């Protein structure tokens, strides 16, 4: 509004000021000009008084309202609000008035309000400068001042000091762990995280201690703006210094915790890399020791009394300064000395407790302490073991033997590293466990590679050549598996059994129903469950076909007539030279044996109608003919008995039999056979 706009009264102020310049002082006139009608001597004081009155009555209220508006607009912006309130209070408190501060505040605000109008800005600045030359005391708005002070007091003094510390410390060089880990520091990843320079030992000594006290004094100097005293009583000082250290060491610990949490050992791509990494960690310039040295140097601090004494000395230095600031500093120095053992130390104590376990890993000469030495010895053994496994033309076989031994309980350097690491504090414990775990994973991977080669060369190749896509594994195949091939593959000490015993058995366990991979440290061979399932099928097939003779397939079974259509007079089942003839009447089971010795296993079922007409089915493809004939029949478990019901349908004529095997699982239940499919890779 015009009542608030200083620009609106600028012409009037200019006119009033120029009027004071019309008459020169009498001392500046020639002698003849002083005589006669010259009225300057009595007029100049009147004009000046009028101009000063306009400055006080027109310009000053507008400036005050201008400042009040800025205060209201920035109640949520503490830094701006503090400057606005300070300038506003200077209008009403001559004892705290600083002309340069007021001039700067108004010049900045007018530049914002009247951007581009340099002439008007210059004119207003000149008028305000003349206003400052005369005494005045503007009646401030106590309600607004109280509101502003309440807003300012929402942020504690310690937070203000800490905020200023952080802002002023931005010029400090940033800290990165990777710049201090030596030539082999690349074994660590994530060590490039930036830590602000304030949160280092150098930042603590050269900035926090050196600048903390002076910032307290600078802020205390503004306490009059808050309506508070510029000195601190013992309780206030204790609280302030305690809160400042709490804020600082809380963030200090957070920065170092976060930086260390990002550090990890580089992932391994081979056992050679694992050997190199273990070797680097125990080398003369071990990056692990270098990292621990950096942690200790930057997270080990003086005791509470020593720390406070340093702050006291800093305050005492400033106390030697002359003037009000020196007096305030002297008060702080005196009170700090008296309270040296009373400042709360919770945040610092927490930081020291957090990192003390890492400090203990080093001796006073920055070497490995007795807590760390066993781990370094275990790492040396691991380096040698991994190097041995990764060398030579038979490295895969050596790795396979190593994995087999460890899976079966033999201790190794990997176990020693795990045991030693478990006694160390994190994150060192995590790093070394990761090294051991990654190395073990690589060992298992190389063992799998070796095992997969053996599998493809010794088992899968035989399977594809002799069994794959042949009957009885494929029900509709026209090609039968040679009985000799079947025998050599599935018999005890046959192809499948030898492969399992030689290569797989050390790595698996059997719970009575299925095979499971054994694991150590939560890891097992990276092979698929499919192969284990197929090894289970091998066992099922062996128990069904080789129960009578471990070296030859042999099935003894009995066939018992169950029912015959009334239109049939008899049914004749034949396997080689073995026969069961059934007519209506007493049921007499017959014993059979497969494979049949005669007629190459020719199998048939012939039924005869009452009229004498005969019809039937016959299979003569070799020893698997019996199974092919049974495949033409409907099979189902017979309720209440461990037998299969065979239901033959020959042109609508039905004959049913009960098939009883002396072994379990029933070899004529071909579920395991039909599900037997070896994958191309483990």
Language model features with spans:
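C-terminal domain/tail detector
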Residues: 2-682
């Amino acid at each position: 509004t015009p009542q608030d706009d200083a620009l609106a009264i600028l012409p009037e102020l200019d006119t009033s000021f120029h009027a004071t310049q019309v008459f020169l002082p009498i001392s500046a006139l020639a002698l003849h000009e002083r005589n006669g009608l010259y009225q300057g001597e009595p007029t100049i004081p009147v004009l000046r008084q009028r101009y000063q009155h306009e400055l006080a009555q027109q310009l000053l209220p507008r400036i005050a309202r201008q400042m009040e508006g800025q205060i209201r607009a920035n109640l949520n912006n503490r830094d701006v609000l503090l400057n606005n309130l300070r300038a506003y209070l200077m209008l009403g408190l001559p004892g705290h008035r600083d002309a340069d501060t007021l001039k700067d505040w108004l010049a900045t605000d007018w530049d914002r309000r009247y951007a581009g109008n340099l002439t008007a800005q210059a004119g207003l600045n000149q008028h305000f400068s003349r206003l400052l030359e005369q005494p005045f005391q503007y009646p401030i708005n106590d309600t607004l001042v109280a509101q502003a002070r309440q807003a300012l007091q929402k942020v504690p003094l310690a937070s203000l000091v800490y905020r200023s510390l952080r802002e002023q410390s931005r010029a400090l060089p940033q800290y990165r762990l990777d710049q201090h880990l030596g030539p082999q520091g690349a074994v660590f990843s994530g060590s490039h995280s930036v830590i602000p320079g304030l949160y280092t030992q150098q930042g603590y000594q050269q900035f926090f201690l050196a600048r903390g006290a002076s910032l307290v004094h600078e802020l205390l100097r503004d306490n009059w703006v808050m309506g508070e005293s510029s000195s601190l009583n013992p309780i206030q000082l204790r609280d302030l210094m305690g809160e400042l250290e709490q804020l600082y060491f809380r963030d200090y610990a957070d920065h170092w915790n976060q930086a260390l949490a990002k550090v990890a050992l580089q992932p391994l791509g081979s056992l050679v890399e694992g050997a190199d990494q273990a070797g680097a960690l125990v080398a003369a310039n071990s990056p692990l020791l270098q990292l621990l040295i950096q942690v200790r140097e930057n997270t080990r601090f003086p005791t509470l009394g020593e720390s406070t004494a340093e702050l006291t000395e800093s305050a005492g230095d400033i106390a030697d300064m002359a003037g009000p600031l020196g007096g305030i500093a002297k008060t702080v120095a005196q009170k700090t000395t008296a309270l040296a053992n009373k400042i709360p130390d919770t945040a610092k104590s927490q930081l020291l407790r957090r990192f003390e376990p890492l400090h203990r890993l080093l001796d006073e000469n920055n070497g490995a302490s007795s807590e760390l030495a066993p781990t370094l010895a275990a790492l040396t053994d691991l380096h040698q073991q991994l190097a041995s496994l990764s060398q030579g033309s038979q490295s895969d076989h050596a790795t396979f033997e190593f994995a087999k031994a460890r899976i079966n309980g033999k201790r190794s350097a990997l176990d020693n590293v795990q045991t030693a690491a478990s006694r160390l504090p994190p994150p060192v414990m995590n790093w070394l466990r990761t090294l051991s775990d990654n190395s073990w994973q690589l060992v298992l991977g190389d063992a799998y590679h070796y095992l997969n080669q053996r599998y493809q060369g010794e088992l899968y190749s035989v399977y594809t050549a002799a069994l794959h896509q042949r009957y009885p594994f494929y029900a509709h195949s026209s090609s039968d598996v040679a009985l000799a091939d079947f025998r050599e593959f599935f018999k005890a000490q046959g192809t499948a059994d030898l492969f399992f015993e030689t290569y797989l058995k050390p790595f698996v366990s059997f719970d009575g129903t299925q095979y499971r991979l054994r694991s150590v440290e939560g890891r097992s061979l990276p092979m698929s469950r499919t192969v284990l399932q197929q090894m289970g099928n091998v066992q099922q097939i062996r128990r069904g076909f080789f129960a009578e003779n471990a070296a030859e397939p042999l099935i003894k079974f009995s066939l018992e007539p169950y029912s015959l259509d009334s239109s049939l007079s008899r049914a004749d089942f034949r396997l080689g030279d073995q026969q069961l003839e059934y007519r209506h009447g007493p049921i007499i089971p017959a014993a059979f044996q497969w494979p049949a010795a005669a007629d190459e296993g020719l199998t048939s079922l012939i039924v005869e109608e009452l009229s004498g007409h005969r019809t039937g089915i016959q299979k003569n493809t070799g020893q698997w003919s019996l199974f092919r004939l049974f495949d033409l029949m409907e099979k189902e478990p017979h309720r209440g008995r461990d037998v299969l019901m065979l239901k033959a349908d020959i042109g609508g004529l039905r004959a049913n039999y009960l098939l009883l095997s002396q072994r379990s699982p029933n070899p004529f239940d071909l579920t395991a056979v039909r599900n037997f499919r070896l994958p191309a890779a483990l």
